[in-house]
């Protein structure tokens, strides 16, 4: 508690916000990916990609007002996953836009969107590794906000000897697909979450 309070006080004194990182690093799929990186299964890592988006929350105007947005709502999961796997960012470049200037939400009806609903980040990590994250509230997804049944990869890593893809969202993973020079046909690993739920960090 004491260390957390000190961080909170420091952030407040500088006019900044602070929140706990999502618990995506607790999943067995994350652990498997980290193990493969540490073992050198992918060779020299070059790049990674994170993707998370849907058509936007309808239950609250908060997401479209100042201090809301897709990055703190969605992108933060991918940031936690990729910095957890690749280490901290040495440099960051980001761009945000508003794609849908008006929304209808349950608590306020029709509103003007005043915070980004479309964001992209590029991070530079150690050893020349680059990662890219895209998130937004304008992405049609047939699996919806909850992503149930999602079979596409939303986290991907590429190296000189192989590539690896987390299937499903990083907060609700369904497995990891791995391909290497030695085994080019993708193999699925860790299809079970073993009790992991994203709310562990809430």
Kindly label every feature range from the protein language model.
Residues 155, 182-202:
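C-terminal helical cap and adjacent loop that interface with cofactors, partners, or active-site loops
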Residues 44, 132, 165-166, 184-188:
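A sequence-level detector of short linear motifs
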Residues 14-20, 24-114:
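Predominantly a Rossmann-like dinucleotide-binding segment in NAD(P)-dependent oxidoreductases
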Residues 80-175:
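Contiguous beta-strand/loop segments that form the cofactor/metal-binding neighborhood of enzyme cores
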Residues 33, 176-178:
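Hydrophobic beta-strand positions in blades of beta-propellers and related beta-sheet-rich domains
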